[in-house]
Amino acid sequence: MTKKFLSVCVYCGSSSGINPVYADAAKELGRALVKHHLSLVYGGGHVGLMGIVADAVLDAGGEVTGVIPKALMDTEVGHERLTRLLVVKDMHERKALMAEHADGFIAMPGGIGTLEELFETLTWAQLGFHEKPIGLLNVAGFYDPLIEFLRHQTSQGFLRAEHKDLLLMETEPDPLIAELKTFTMPKGVSWLSRQRAQTLGP
C-alpha cells in the first residue's frame, strides 16, 4: 500500500459466543494490533467480542476509537475507557464513520450485524468506492461455511473470482495483519472502473 497503514476497523459480535476460543482470539487480535503499531476502530461497545478486543488494545497501551449510535449509548452499552468515543445519530452514520477512520478492516466471528458490515465493506470495494484491504479472521473454522458459500457463488456465476479474492482470509492475527499491510488493489477489479473502461474504450 502507498498510504500509511495506521488503523484497523474490527467487525465482531456483541456477544462472546459459546466457545471460549472466540474471546481468546479477540484478546490475541487486540494485542497483535498494538504490536504492529495499529490503532483500533470499532463499534464502541463494552459487551461481547467488541468489548474484549477493545480492552485488549487498551490494556496493551494502544489507542481505540469507538463509534456508537446514540440509541445504543443511551442503553449504557458504550465503552467508557476508550481513547475516543464518537456518538452518532444512526447505524448508517456509524458504518460510514468507522470506514472513514480506518485504513483496513478485519471481521471476526459475529452475527447478522457483523456480516452486514463485512459485506457492505466488500460491496464498496467491489464498486470501487474504496481500495482498503478487508480481512476475515477465521477463528476455529467459524467462517468455513461462509467461505464455501462464496466459492459456490463464484462457481454459479454470481460472484467474480477477483471480487471473492478481495477478502483476505487467515486463521491467526499476525499473518492477516501482514497481508493487510501489503495489500494493493488490483487494477480493473472495481465494477465502476470496468464500466468506465468499456465506455471510454482503449
Regions found by a protein language model. Give the residues of each.
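A cross-family phosphate/adenosyl-ligand binding-site feature
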Residues: 1-101, 140-174, 179, 184-202
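Gly/Pro- and small hydrophobic-enriched strand-loop and loop-to-helix capping segments
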Residues: 63-65, 127-140
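Active-site/ligand-binding-proximal alpha/beta "capping" segment
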Residues: 93-128, 135, 187-192
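Flexible, glycine/proline-enriched loop segments at strand-loop-helix junctions
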Residues: 108-109, 133-137, 164-167
